[in-house]
Amino acid sequence: MHPSEMQRKAPPRRRRHRNRAPLTHKMNKMVTSEQMKLPSTKKAEPPTWAQLKKLTQLATKYLENTKVTQTPESMLLAALMIVSMVSAGVPNSSEETATIENGP
């Protein structure tokens, strides 16, 4: 082998990233109190144990009806789907979702 072939090639130079500090500084200046609050925003109370139990039952029932394997991840997604449907006011013939919304 020729000695010039044995030399290692230098890695290509990386491009320097531009400084993003000004954008970060602007974001840090934003205060949540300055953001517009919607008049429909309401303060929610923490859910009761009965509401959590009912939500778990509804999520389990939903997963059984859709024949999805019951895993912690699928239970969480089913519970989030139920909560979002209730909060969005999606009509449902079941009285069970009204129980979550209004309490036991």
Swiss-Prot record:
- GO MF terms held by the record: RNA binding
Q: Which GO terms describe its biological process?
A: mRNA transport
Q: Which UniProt keywords apply?
A: Cytoplasm, ERV, mRNA transport, Nucleus, RNA-binding, Transport, Transposable element
User: Where are the residues of the annotated region Disordered?
Assistant: 1-48
What positions carry the motif Nuclear export signal?
A: 49-58
| Role | Retroviral replication requires the nuclear export and translation of unspliced, singly-spliced and multiply-spliced derivatives of the initial genomic transcript. Rec interacts with a highly structured RNA element (RcRE) present in the viral 3'LTR and recruits the cellular nuclear export machinery. This permits export to the cytoplasm of unspliced genomic or incompletely spliced subgenomic viral transcripts.
The protein in question is named Endogenous retrovirus group K member 21 Rec protein
List the source organism: Homo sapiens
